[in-house]
Amino acid sequence: MSGFLRWFGGNRSKDTTKDTIVRFQEMLALYDKKEEVLERQIAEQTEIARKNATTNKRLALTALKRKKMHENELVKIEGSRNNIEQQLFSIQNANLNFETLQAMRQGAEAMKSIQRGMDADKVDQIMDKIRDQQTISEEISTMISTPVGLNAEIDEDELANELDELQQMELDSKMLGAEKPPVHTPAVPAVPSQVKDLPSISKPQELDEEEELRKLQAEFSL
């Protein structure tokens, strides 16, 4: 098998293997056509022999001989076809195995190249460095977030005590306010803020009313 692989994959290019496979497939197609022709010829000679079996024995025997020749040729073609199919199957399997082996070899080389500069000790050293840097980063963040200046001098406990005192004073004030008796103020009716103006009578209207009054008095005097 190793020599077979070297012939198809080692010393020859991949194109050689592909060309061989294509060539075998073409031969199988040719054998298919040849078998169809021989089978048709066998059927034709069989029909000729049947038709002339009683009327023309000489022609019938000749047809049977040709039929036998075609049958023998068909057997040879079928044998050659089987051999080609077996070879093609073997070549395809060998090529598949070779390609698989090549892929596995390339994968191993790639892993070797990737891991060339790595081992357990180096990985452990790198992880230690990462942890150290993380610790330093946390310390820096803590230092940066620590108040400085006036804020750093403020006593949080003192502020809390002062706040408690203010809250107690507020509660005491509310309690004192609640103890005083409520003062009731009698309700005073609301005074209109503005008096509506009475309608004024115009002077012409007053003259008309006086005139009408005099007319009434004159009528009653009559």
From Swiss-Prot:
Coiled-coil regions listed: 24-111, 150-176
Region annotation Disordered: where it falls in the sequence: 178-222
Gene Ontology process terms (BP): late endosome to vacuole transport; late endosome to vacuole transport via multivesicular body sorting pathway; mitotic nuclear membrane reassembly; protein transport to vacuole involved in ubiquitin-dependent protein catabolic process via the multivesicular body sorting pathway; vesicle budding from membrane
Disulfide bonds: none
InterPro entries xref list: Snf7_fam
Record field: transmembrane: none
Start-end of Basic and acidic residues biased regions: 212-222
A GO CC term attached to the entry: mitotic spindle pole body attachment site
Keywords: Coiled coil, Cytoplasm, Endosome, Membrane
Location(s) in or outside the cell: Cytoplasm; Endosome membrane
Membrane topology: Peripheral membrane protein
Pfam family membership, one: Snf7
Family, similarity comment: Belongs to the SNF7 family.
Role of this protein: Required for the sorting and concentration of proteins resulting in the entry of these proteins into the invaginating vesicles of the multivesicular body (MVB).
The protein's assembly and partners: A component of the endosomal sorting required for transport complex III (ESCRT-III).
Protein name as catalogued: Vacuolar-sorting protein snf7
Organism of derivation: Schizosaccharomyces pombe (strain 972 / ATCC 24843)
